Amino acid sequence: EAGDDKAILLMMKWGYEGSKAFIGGNPVKKIINSSREIIEILSVDLKACNNYKSGKESLEKINCPTLCIFGDLDKMVPLKVGNKMSELIKNSETKVITDCGHMIIFEKAFEMRKIVKEFILKLKK
C-alpha cells in the first residue's frame, strides 16, 4: 500500500535503534536485504496487531513467572508501554537493556541470553 516502503524502513531503523547498521556486536551480521523481502509479511502482522483488542485481559490472565525484557530505545514498544504491560502480569519481572531498540535478540544477543539464563536458574531454586 502507499508508503509501505517508508514505513518498513522506519520500523527497521526504530527496531534496531541501539545498533549501527543493524549490527549488535553478536553473531548476526545482517538481518534483512531489502524492505521488499518482508513487505507482505509485515502487512499481515500489522493488520493482526491493529485488530487485536484483548491484550489487557490476556495479560491479566498470565499467572506463571514471566520475564519481560525491553530495550530502552525501543520506539515500537516504548519502555512506558512495556512497563504498563508487565504491571498487568502477575509474578512478572522486568529487565531493561540499554542502548537497544525493539530487536533485542539481534542487537544485544549475549546480554539477553545472560538475563534469560539468570531468570531460569532463579526459577529452579
Model-identified regions with their sequence ranges:
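Short alpha-helix in the alpha/beta-hydrolase fold that links the catalytic acid
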Residues: C64, P78-E87
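Catalytic active-site module of serine/aspartate enzymes centered on a nucleophile-bearing elbow/loop
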Residues: S92-K125
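A short, basic/aromatic alpha-helical/loop segment that forms part
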Residues: Y52-K53, K75-M76, M103-E107
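Structural signature of beta-strand start/N-cap positions in the alpha/beta core
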Residues: S58, P65-L67, K90-E93
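Conserved catalytic core of Hanks-type protein kinase domains
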Residues: K61, L88, F106
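Generic recognition of short, well-ordered alpha-helical segments
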Residues: E57, K80-K84, E107-F110
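Conserved alpha/beta-hydrolase catalytic His-Asp/Glu region
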Residues: A2-K61
